[in-house]
């Protein structure tokens, strides 16, 4: 973008509300003003692939398919790396499971705020994603003997897992359709792994 000399950045409720030359940004009466003459103002940096602040390892290595595990459960909110990242201008991180699994765990998108609990760092109303690793990483992760050990095995693991997830969803769809007709039905057994997929 363009450099704005003699500009104003208006922040309301912790978010940038307006940016522009001083003459074009209306500053509300009573607003706190910070003279940043000679300084640079940049938006916060986003780290789209982070393993920051994971405590106790970021891979669930005993199985190649683990979408039921959640990174938020192992976030160390007191890790100094969070403070250092924030001091360096990083405001948001996407903390991911490691790459040892064909289908790994659920990510956590965190808004960095020093002194807050892990749950307080989580963005509200954000759908979690699941980390996938293809090819070499999952087949090289051989801390324990487990399948897959070839690229063919990695690809099959994906196909099989998605087929099982589709079958699981179909059972729940059938259950919901039956209930919507006013018929009592026995709910399928809940499976957190397939639910995550």
Where are these regions (language model features)?
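Extracytoplasmic/secreted proteins, especially bacterial periplasmic and envelope-associated proteins
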Residues: 11, 18, 80, 84, ...
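Histidine-rich, glycine-flanked metal-binding segment
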Residues: 2-42
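Amphipathic coiled-coil/heptad-repeat helices and related helical stalk/stem segments
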Residues: 77-78, 193
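A mature extracytoplasmic/lumenal domain signature
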Residues: 13-15, 21-23, 50, 97-99, ...
């Amino acid at each position: 973008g363009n450099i704005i000399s003699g500009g104003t950045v208006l922040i309301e409720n912790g978010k940038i509300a307006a940016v522009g030359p001083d003459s074009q940004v209306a500053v509300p009466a009573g607003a706190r003003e910070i003279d940043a003459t000679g300084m640079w103002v940049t938006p916060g940096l986003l780290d789209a692939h982070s393993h920051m602040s994971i405590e106790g390892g970021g891979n669930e290595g005993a199985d190649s398919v683990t979408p039921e595990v959640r990174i938020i459960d192992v976030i160390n909110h007191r890790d100094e790396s969070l403070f250092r990242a924030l001091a360096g201008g990083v405001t948001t991180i996407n903390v991911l499971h490691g790459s040892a699994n064909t289908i790994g765990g659920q990510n956590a998108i965190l808004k960095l705020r020093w002194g807050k609990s892990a749950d307080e760092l989580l963005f509200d109303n954000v759908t979690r994603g699941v980390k996938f690793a293809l090819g070499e990483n999952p087949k090289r992760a051989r801390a324990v003997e487990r399948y897959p050990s070839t690229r063919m095995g990695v690809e099959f693991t994906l196909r099989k897992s998605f087929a099982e997830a589709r079958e699981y969803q179909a059972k729940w769809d059938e259950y919901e359709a039956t209930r919507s007709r006013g018929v009592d039905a026995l709910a399928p057994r809940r499976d957190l792994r397939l639910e995550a997929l």
